[in-house]
Amino acid sequence: MKLTSIPIASTLLSLLAASGTLASPLHKRDDPLNNKQFGLMSIHSGNSYVHLHPFYVGDSGAIYLDPTDGTSTSAVFSMSNGRLVVGNLYASVDSNGTTIFKSDANAASTKFSAGDATNVGYNLLYNGTQSAVACPASDNDQVYQVYFGAGNGNPNCAGIAIEAFVSPSSSSSSSSSAATSTSTRVSSSAKASTSSGAIAYTTKCVVVPVTASATATAKAASAAASSAVYPLFPHGIRLIDSANPSSNSGNVYSPVVFQKQNNHTNTIFTFDVPQVSGSCELNLHLDTSGFPITVEGSNGVGQFILFNLSSVANDSTVYSNRPNRIAEIGRFNCSSSGCDYATNVTCPNSYTAVSYEMMALTDDSYLSFFEEADPLEGLTLRV
């Protein structure tokens, strides 16, 4: 928390003292996350167990980065005077950082706060620092539990940054006043209810509110920009290679697309889809503000094409068994300075998954980049 501007406050106090008038007490600034609804997402590049994972609160009250412990839907949080809240539960942090949500407000930690603003919200701090750690859960080393401290001692624990992305319904770019709506914990039985404005989404689906600049970019990129609200990041990115048709890349963070004569390396993007708003848009935004992008092609410009697919790619998908293409979605060019492309697509059904394939259109066209949330870079699906 910061006090009001010290030079201004000092000047006012001096003037009031000189005039014999009593000064009003100084107040701490209101935390920008106070009484807002927001989702939380972990950031740790290069670690697929923790990078770009939403937060889940299990039946035990512990925080996880994947569905487990009786929950299948990521949590919606709020902040109240330094306390992290899910529904009527409050985060309690013990000496080793174990964090459990409990109904006892008196046991709640009051050390949570918003850090620096980002493109999609704020960094979440505990005790003024980014001290969070994600460790393999004791009963499942494929699922990581979040601690605000030392962790559980597992050698595979990883430090994480935490991004809080605020629901558009509880914040406004033109007003800093806090919303009065209360946070709700979204259960699997209530997935279809979003009237509260809470951000609800399914397994590994990362939902980030659209910023004003991102919206303007999308509109400039496509005259047919839809009214879709949230960009979803892919939870699966898989490379398929015609020269090695049985080779499995696994899940990657850096899509690669190129064509060399008859050899193709294509990328399949898979998205988990929450409740659909009624219109959907596929959007690609790349520039030089994030991780480096690599583009090759005629006169430095690569040409690429997108397809929608008949089924969803999975961990066993390779070039030889890739899903069939339904139709071409569109084509776009990209250079070393980046590219913007947006097009309306047929909406998938709510609470399903959908895959799209990106391919080079011309010989020697090459594109590689890194999907990231801050700054917003890569291919996203808006629903």
UniProtKB/Swiss-Prot annotation:
UniProt keywords (A-Z) are:
Cytoplasm, Nucleus, Signal
Determine if Signal is one of this entry's keywords.
Answer: yes
Name the predominant localization.
cytoplasm
Q: Does the keyword Cytoplasm apply?
A: yes
Q: Which residues form the signal peptide?
A: 1-23
What residue ranges are annotated as transmembrane? none
Per the record, the domain of life is Eukaryota
Give an example GO cellular component term for this record.
nucleus
Localization, UniProt:
Cytoplasm; Nucleus
Q: Which family does it belong to?
A: Belongs to the but2 family.
Protein known as: Uncharacterized but2-like protein C27D7.09c
Organism for this UniProt entry:
Schizosaccharomyces pombe (strain 972 / ATCC 24843)
